[in-house]
Amino acid sequence: MNKIKPEIKDNIAETLFIPLLSRAHESHRKDAILKDPMACELVEKIDYDFAKFGKITMSTTGTAIRLRHFDRLVQRFIDRKVTEDPVVVSIGCGLDSRFQRVSNHNQATFYELDLPEVINLREKLFPASAKDLTIKGSMLETDWMDMLRQKHPHGRFLF
């Protein structure tokens, strides 16, 4: 398998590998709180020295609990059907695979927002989907919010 070499230069952006590794480790546990096959696949696809993070067992459990909680919130948001246009926006998405984990994902539009170098890597790793879109930018800018409002004038948003 040809591995993908990340071109992440920013130290903050590089932290995206920690929760990815946590999700992959958790998924391999027999009594896993969160199963994330996509995380396992991504760790195998990326040419990166994950060993530099050492043992991350303490943060693995916390990450799994937090992600399972947010996955359930997203699932309920979509299931409530309070709008014909539910929109889920993941700010600072990194390499999170919530779209793949949430079973009713095709009933909503997902947007993954992160720094350009992170989104560039994400677009190489994740399968393209008309329901899981990316936004290159900073959460501190507001132009992406205006774009979402234009695209989804009757949308109900979950950030």
Could you tell me what each predicted segment is?
Residues 1-89, 93-137, 142-143, 147-153:
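Rossmann-like AdoMet
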Residues 153-159:
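Short SAM/SAH-binding signature in class I
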